[in-house]
Amino acid sequence: IRSYNKDVGILLMGYIANLYKYPIKKFVDDIKKAGADAVLVVDAPHELKEENELRNALNDNGLSLIKLAAPTTDQKRLEDIIKISSGFIYQVNVSGVTGVKSANETDVTNFVKSIKKITNIPVCSGFGIKSPEDAKKVANSGCNGVIVGSTFVKYIQDNLGAPHLTQSFGKQVKSFSEVLK
């Protein structure tokens, strides 16, 4: 991907269990060589020793640690998350499992505003974005970016084995990106 497009950001998303199997310094060295820009460990609280080690290793290598801020995040914790985040804040639009609920436009806008009151770090909104229309509504919240994940994963799962999956998936992605121009 990096050789194809030097401008697109590459974010690796995973779970803390992976870091128990892979020495953190080696992990960061390897992902830097591979061209990654940032890491998001979705289930690691910032108080966790391993996340602190990861954050330091990423910072030492000029890479970003992306943190989640959910609607249930209290003000003190939000401020702590902002202090240790780099790259952008991943603003979670809905409580619960990604891909299940739809985002509420007013709630998203209010949460984006509350984050932007206390930081200049970009805010990217994700969770609950099931359609291009949802993406457009979220984009209008004042966020700096829209993250679509589960919808694309579901599309691929539902169409595995279909002829021309790559082309049809490209059209699916384009339907989202066109409304965001």
Stretches found by the model and what they are:
Residues 73-84, 125, 129-146:
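Catalytic cores of alpha/beta
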Residues 9-13, 37-38, 64-66, 87-89, ...:
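Structural preference for beta-strand elements that scaffold enzyme active sites
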Residues 60-99:
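Histidine/lysine/aspartate-rich catalytic loop segments that bind and position anionic ligands
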Residues 1, 19-25, 43-60, 74-79, ...:
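Active-site-adjacent beta->alpha loops and helix N-cap segments on the catalytic face
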Residues 1-44, 171-174, 178-180:
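Active-site beta->alpha loop and helix N-cap motifs at the rims of alpha/beta catalytic domains
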